[in-house]
A protein has these predicted regions:
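Noncatalytic scaffold domains of N-terminal-nucleophile
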Residues: 19-49, 61-224, 229-231, 236-281, ...
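Bacterial Sec-dependent N-terminal signal peptides
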Residues: 1-20
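Glycine-rich phosphate/pyrophosphate-binding beta-alpha loops
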Residues: 275-283, 371-375, 387-398
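Internal maturation/activation junctions in enzymes
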Residues: 295-389, 402-403, 410
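Short glycine-rich loop/turn motifs
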Residues: 36-38, 85-87, 262-264, 286, ...
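Active-site rim segments in enzyme catalytic domains, especially the processed small/beta chain
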Residues: 74-78, 84-99, 248-250, 382-425
Length: 425
């Protein structure tokens, strides 16, 4: 069973186009970027350049997206990496079709609700071996590559292998997040210090970071394909380590893992079709918010005003309530996605908003997740929207020896109460 996947969604910023600071509003800080031969956007400049270089070599949007994701797993391990999951949408020019990929992993087959009940757990821990599910990222790479890739995987992963071996400078933000996570986990779990510190010390802004362990893992993946990760030594060593730490993830869980090609879902917002992946992702929360907020005329509501903030907050609270109550593995949802995305349902939810006071909705808890987002377009017009995550923060704290990555803690999302949409089973 796959658990509920949370992503960080930033909504309801100004609806104006990007403008130069001199010609636009005072708070405008970025110009529109226009390119003739493709474009890459990510949270890390070096990773973005890796993607651009792949496009220059004739790679597709998918080739570049995989290369960027691999670089981010090295350069921003606080939110991503091959120990996590992957979700993607691909626009294919040739078929004029939008494809969706759910590359999230399932919980260990041997870990049952009965175990948590007998050991008096009221919730799944956020760290350690128990929240670890099968990491789906690498399988996601190869699923995407088999359909839409062009360059050899060795070429795609080589830039990240080089950076892992030769080093790269740590940015201020990532140094901050690394310090928070490493200082906590290195006191609790093995292999964290050896993998993520610089000469045994917490990384500081500007420090040159290397990760030979991850370079070796990338080399194995580049040479041996997805089976090198799921049916080889990486899977065996990871499963052995997790079980030594008291967990249940087994080699068989890796060997039987598969990603799923799925149909994206959409809503129409003021004439624009907006697409997302269905649960177990939380992308439809964005679509629900758009449906509810569509009826408000923001040309008459000043941006940042009390009224504007009130509407946005109430809409988010309503949708987060649905997210907590209904979103789950699509095979186990008790309400159809089409119902949640209907305009009639949005109108009923909108009617609950009092324009003068905050509603007492039992909103779902907003997660503090570690996630990276990237998007790529190539010269032919193919486009990729990809999100990849270790879930909360840097992940579970579980770092298999000499592999260079931390495993996700997405299993924390399961509900241990019986009968809910996202109950552990």
């Amino acid at each position: 069973m796959k658990n509920l996947f949370f992503t960080l969604v930033l909504l309801f910023t100004t609806l104006t186009q990007a403008q130069d600071r001199l010609t636009g509003r005072n708070f405008a800080s970025r110009s529109e970027i226009i390119s003739q031969h493709g474009m890459v956007a990510s949270s890390q400049p070096l990773a973005t350049q890796v993607g651009i270089d792949i496009l220059k070599k004739g790679g597709t949007a998918v080739d570049a997206a995989i290369a960027v994701n691999a670089a981010l797993g090295l350069m921003e391990p606080t939110g991503s990496g091959v120990g996590g999951d992957l979700f993607a949408m691909v626009w294919d020019v040739k078929t004029q079709k939008l494809y969706g990929l759910n590359a999230s992993g399932r919980s260990p087959k041997a870990l049952t609700l009965d175990y948590f009940t007998k050991n008096n757990y009221t919730k799944i821990p956020s760290s350690g071996p128990l929240p670890v599910s099968v990491p789906g990222c690498v399988d996601g790479w190869f699923e995407l590559h088999s359909k839409f890739g062009k360059l050899p995987m060795q070429d795609i992963l080589q830039p990240s292998i080089k950076y892992a071996e030769e080093g790269f400078p740590t940015t201020e933000l990532i140094a901050y997040y690394l310090q928070m996570s490493i200082s906590k986990y290195m006191k609790q779990f093995p292999n964290v210090k050896e993998t993520y510190t610089v000469d045994g010390k917490l990384p500081q802004k500007g420090d040159i970071i290397r990760n030979q362990f991850l370079a070796n893992t990338y080399k194995k993946i580049a040479k041996g394909g997805r089976d090198a990760f799921y049916k080889g030594d990486i899977a065996r060593e990871t499963a052995k380590f997790i079980q030594e730490q008291g967990g249940f993830l087994a080699y068989e869980d890796f060997a039987t893992h598969r990603s799923d090609w799925i149909q994206p879902v959409s809503t129409n917002y003021r004439g624009y079709d907006v697409w997302e992946l269905p649960p177990n992702g939380q992308g439809i929360a964005t679509l629900q918010m758009l449906n509810i907020i569509e009826a408000y005329d923001f040309s008459k509501i000043p941006f940042g005003s009390a009224q504007h903030l009130h509407i946005v907050n109430e809409v988010k609270k309503l949708v987060f309530e649905d997210r907590a109550k209904y979103y789950a593995d699509s095979d186990h949802m008790k309400i159809q996605v089409s119902e949640l995305l209907s305009k009639d349902y949005a109108a009923k939810r909108r009617a609950l908003i009092d324009p003068n006071r905050a509603g007492e909705f039992q909103a779902g808890k907003e997660s503090n997740s570690g996630t990276v987002y990237l998007t790529v377009a190539d010269k032919d017009g193919n486009m990729v929207s990809l999100i990849q995550s270790n879930y909360r923060g840097m992940g579970s704290g579980m770092v298999p020896p000499q592999l260079g990555f931390m495993l996700q803690d997405r299993g924390e999302c399961f509900n241990l109460a019986e009968g809910t949409a996202n109950s552990y089973a």
